[in-house]
């Protein structure tokens, strides 16, 4: 079992060697080793070493020794390296050529211009008489005449197409979906995690959106009406996250103490991930599970405060990943079941439980995007970003506690729990006014608390 000091060190950063098995998922790929040409390794002082001047009486002896010894040979000077290959100037613009491309000697600029023009079926227009002079100074002034010059000097359309098809074939062979087949066990795991996520978090298209005009146009320190609504929805979201955790294979097999430790550590991470997947960039809004849709200003006024822009920026960074529900569920599970959290009783057991989740996400993401091999590590890097946001969120809770008129809602309080942070609230254990009987954790022993998710 790792010591507290070791866990504290591990919790500082997410990456190989902490929560993830480093050997299984390397993110750094060493470059190919290159040997130095043998003659470049020799000191210049040893190249072409001649015989030193000798006295006349020794010269004949030296010559005789050299001629009669069959074992001693004077090394000849190394032949000079061949001169670098010189190509004719670019046939299109007369600039320095980098080689033969698409059938003619051409520079990198004209090679790239011709390739892009053919691959994208570009149609250009000449604003003069279609006889512009093309050289290295004027080549960017008229794309029409430059392309015509490419054809005139012999550049081949077919060579571009063949090159493109060859690259596509290589990518297809390297990343064929058949090479990322999932075992029956991983297929079953993915199905269970995906179902757990979908049944505890409806997708954006399933929600009936509605909006409010409350403080929609200007930022204020805190809109109490929006805060009450947000805290109510956040409480329900935490309950759903606990339910999600209980449905993950193996989670309830952990000790009760470790289940609570993992939930408290990751709950805010998963909450942020979930709300950010409901970001609509066209309107710059986020939608909650009941359909309430708030713009950036309203999110600020609902309690996010200075955290708002950081959360919206993260939501924007998720968009290029185009994660589906299965990937979001797997990433949430990996975020939750992580052995580098502090105060775990059995971190090794947690790590063992996380390994198949990592493998499932890796293979699923690669099978879904055969030509994008780096999507899996990019997803994992988002967990690091989420932890940074959660740290800022805990800091925001300190100032928010002084802005709201009553106590922090119980589940939110426990999610961010730091004994010193909420010491003044210890005498107010009652539920938040907006909390209902539904706010009790399923299977819990205490109302509104993360007492026992098992």
Swiss-Prot record:
Residues 443-454 have a biased composition (Gly residues). Residues 1-89 are annotated as: Modulating. Residues 185-419 form the NR LBD domain. It comes from the Eukaryota. Coiled coil: none annotated. Residues 90-155 bind DNA. Pfam families: Hormone_recep, zf-C4. GO terms for cellular component: chromatin; cytoplasm; membrane; nucleoplasm; nucleus; transcription regulator complex. Composed of three domains: a modulating N-terminal domain, a DNA-binding domain and a C-terminal ligand-binding domain. Belongs to the nuclear hormone receptor family. NR1 subfamily. This is Retinoic acid receptor gamma. It comes from Homo sapiens (Human). The lineage of its organism: Eukaryota, Metazoa, Chordata, Craniata, Vertebrata. The gene is RARG.
């Amino acid at each position: 079992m790792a010591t507290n000091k070791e866990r504290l060190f591990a919790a500082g950063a997410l990456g190989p060697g902490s929560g993830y098995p480093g050997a299984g998922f390397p993110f750094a790929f060493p470059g190919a080793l290159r040997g130095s040409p043998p003659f470049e390794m020799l000191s210049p002082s040893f190249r072409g070493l001649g015989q030193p001047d000798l006295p006349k009486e020794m010269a004949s002896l030296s010559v005789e020794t050299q001629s009669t010894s069959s074992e001693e040979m004077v090394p000849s000077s190394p032949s000079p390296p061949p001169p670098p290959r010189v190509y004719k100037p670019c046939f299109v613009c007369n600039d320095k050529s980098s080689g033969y491309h698409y059938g003619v000697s051409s520079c990198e600029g004209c090679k790239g211009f011709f390739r892009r023009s053919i691959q994208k079926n570009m149609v250009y227009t000449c604003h003069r008489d279609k006889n512009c002079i093309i050289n290295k100074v004027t080549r960017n002034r008229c794309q029409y005449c430059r392309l015509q010059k490419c054809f005139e000097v012999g550049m081949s359309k077919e060579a571009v197409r063949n090159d493109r098809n060859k690259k596509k074939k290589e990518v297809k062979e390297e990343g064929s979906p058949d090479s990322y087949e999932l075992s029956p066990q991983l297929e079953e795991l993915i199905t269970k995690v995906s179902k757990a996520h979908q049944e505890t978090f409806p997708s954006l298209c399933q929600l009936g959106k509605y909006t409010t005009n409350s403080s929609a146009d200007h930022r204020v320190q805190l809109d109490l009406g929006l805060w009450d609504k947000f805290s109510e929805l956040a409480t329900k979201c935490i309950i759903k996250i606990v339910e999600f955790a209980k449905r993950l294979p193996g989670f309830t097999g952990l000790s009760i103490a470790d289940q609570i430790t993992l939930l408290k550590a990751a709950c805010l991470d998963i909450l942020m991930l979930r709300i950010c997947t409901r970001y609509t960039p066209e309107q710059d809004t986020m939608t909650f599970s009941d359909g309430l849709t708030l713009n950036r200003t309203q999110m600020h006024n609902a309690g996010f405060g200075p955290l708002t822009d950081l959360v919206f920026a993260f939501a924007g960074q998720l968009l290029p990943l185009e994660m589906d529900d299965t990937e979001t569920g797997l990433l949430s599970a990996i975020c939750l079941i992580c052995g580098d959290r502090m105060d775990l009783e059995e971190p090794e057991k947690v790590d063992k439980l996380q390994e198949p989740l990592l493998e499932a996400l890796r293979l699923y993401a690669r099978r879904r995007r055969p030509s994008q091999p780096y999507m899996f590590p990019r997803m994992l890097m988002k967990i690091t970003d989420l932890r940074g946001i959660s740290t800022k969120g805990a800091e925001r809770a300190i100032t928010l506690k002084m802005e709201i008129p009553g106590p922090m809602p119980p589940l939110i309080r426990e999610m961010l729990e730091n004994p010193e942070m909420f010491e003044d609230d210890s005498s107010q254990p009652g539920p938040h006014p907006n909390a209902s009987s539904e706010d009790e954790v399923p299977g819990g022993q205490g109302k509104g608390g993360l007492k026992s998710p098992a």
